[in-house]
Curated annotation (Swiss-Prot):
One of its GO terms (biological process) is astrocyte development. Residues 2-95 are annotated as: Head. The modification N-acetylserine is found at residue 2. It comes from Rattus norvegicus. This is Vimentin.
């Protein structure tokens, strides 16, 4: 039938294929119109209707619908909108009844199809609501959540970077202080080593002096021994001379007794002996004094050298202990410096690794933000496509509603199950009066839309008489 061909062809243009599938279009809207007129007579049937569309730069679509070919055996008879003249019922033949029956079937099919359209529109509206809710959720929660996470992560990264920077500065200050301490200790070590060398050289000179003093003491001891031997020899010689002199004196005394006239030799010998004894005593005293003075000088020099040697040994031991303690301290400072440098290198490596990880995290978050933006854009495009489909469906439903209302007003008969469609309110479009002459009417209707709004609508009629 013609109405079925109109609805089927327009549905295929809208959704493609059967009536259960849909194909959204983002840039096109479709408008289909159909006019149906009837002529009373032996053959009252609607002519086939075709819908053609073409795109124009202004977004206008032209729908052509051929008018109903009317054949009438009763010219001048018209169907009114409010009532039906039942006096002409006898003139309606069996073909008209069949046509009415077919029209009822077609209207019932249109009713079912409209119900399917309404269900689909409701489903699409629900999908639109779901998408709008998701879009609002993405706009609200997604942005705030990602922004908060990003800001929190950036604050944590900045805090860690500041902490690592402070730790690095503190470690560098400690390293500089330790380097200064090491330089100061090295200088002190050099000074101590110089003092040690000076002390060792002084000790070496003292040792040479001690050796010289020892040699001098040995020489003096030998001289003392030789002098003592000489003194003993002189004493022995003196005693022998005294004995000889005493013997001579005794002999002379005897001679004196015999010869009184001889001179007094005893007094002369006594004088000589006294002179020799005084000379010997003087020499012995001088030798003892010289020996004592020399021994005292040597003892004093030895004691002085021993004190200097002992002091030098004590200083050497003290310097050795200081050198050992400083060496241990330098080794400890070297170990501490090495450990600090190793810790600093590890901290720098960890800092570089954490910075790289944070950069990766920032890149990943930026990628997620970009993906969310792309997903939001995709949802917006899908929502726009669904809005375009819904608008096209609304236009087609309005067109079918106008057709049905025109048919209802023409035949002035209630349609079965038509109240269950819950159609939206639209303005009724009155059908033009059709002459009973046999003619073909070509209706060209141009509808211009922009952003889903109808901005211009024109119609042109072309009549071709048969």
């Amino acid at each position: 039938m013609s109405t079925r061909s109109v609805s089927s062809s327009s549905y295929r243009r809208m959704f493609g294929g059967s009536g259960t599938s849909s194909r959204p279009s983002s840039n096109r809207s479709y408008v289909t119109t159909s006019t149906r007129t009837y002529s009373l007579g032996s053959a009252l049937r609607p002519s086939t209707s075709r819908s053609l569309y073409s795109s124009s730069p202004g977004g206008a679509y032209v729908t052509r619908s051929s008018a109903v070919r009317l054949r009438s055996s009763m010219p001048g008879v018209r169907l009114l909108q409010d009532s039906v003249d039942f006096s002409l019922a006898d003139a309606i033949n069996t073909e008209f009844k069949n046509t009415r029956t077919n029209e009822k079937v077609e209207l019932q099919e249109l009713n079912d199809r409209f119900a399917n359209y309404i269900d689909k529109v409701r489903f699409l509206e629900q999908q639109n609501k779901i998408l709008l809710a998701e879009l609002e959720q993405l706009k609200g929660q997604g942005k705030s959540r990602l922004g908060d996470l990003y800001e929190e992560e950036m604050r944590e990264l900045r805090r860690q970077v500041d902490q690592l920077t402070n730790d690095k500065a503190r470690v560098e200050v400690e390293r500089d202080n330790l380097a200064e301490d090491i330089m100061r200790l090295r200088e002190k070590l050099q000074e101590e080593m110089l003092q040690r060398e000076e002390a060792e050289s002084t000790l070496q000179s003292f040792r040479q002096d001690v050796d010289n003093a020892s040699l001098a003491r040995l020489d003096l001891e030998r001289k003392v021994e030789s002098l003592q031997e000489e003194i003993a020899f002189l004493k022995k010689l003196h005693d022998e001379e005294i004995q000889e002199l005493q013997a001579q004196i005794q002999e002379q005394h005897v001679q004196i007794d015999v010869d009184v006239s001889k001179p007094d030799l005893t007094a002369a010998l006594r004088d000589v002996r006294q002179q020799y004894e005084s000379v010997a005593a003087k020499n012995l005293q001088e030798a003892e004094e010289w020996y004592k003075s020399k021994f005292a000088d040597l003892s004093e020099a030895a004691n002085r050298n021993n004190d200097a040697l002992r002091q030098a040994k004590q200083e050497s031991n003290e310097y050795r202990r200081q050198v050992q303690s400083l060496t241990c301290e330098v080794d400890a400072l070297k170990g501490t410096n090495e450990s600090l440098e190793r810790q600093m290198r590890e901290m720098e490596e960890n800092f570089a690794l954490e910075a790289a990880n944070y950069q990766d995290t920032i890149g990943r978050l930026q990628d997620e933000i970009q993906n969310m933006k792309e997903e939001m854009a995709r949802h917006l495009r899908e929502y726009q496509d669904l809005l375009n489909v819904k608008m096209a469906l609304d236009i087609e439903i309005a067109t079918y509603r106008k057709l049905l209302e025109g048919e209802e007003s023409r035949i002035s008969l209630p349609l079965p199950n038509f109240s269950s469609l819950n159609l939206r309110e639209t303005n009724l479009e009155s059908l033009p009066l059709v002459d009973t002459h046999s003619k073909r009417t070509l209706l060209i209707k141009t509808v211009e839309t922009r952003d889903g709004q109808v901005i211009n609508e024109t119609s042109q009629h072309h009549d071709d008489l048969e």
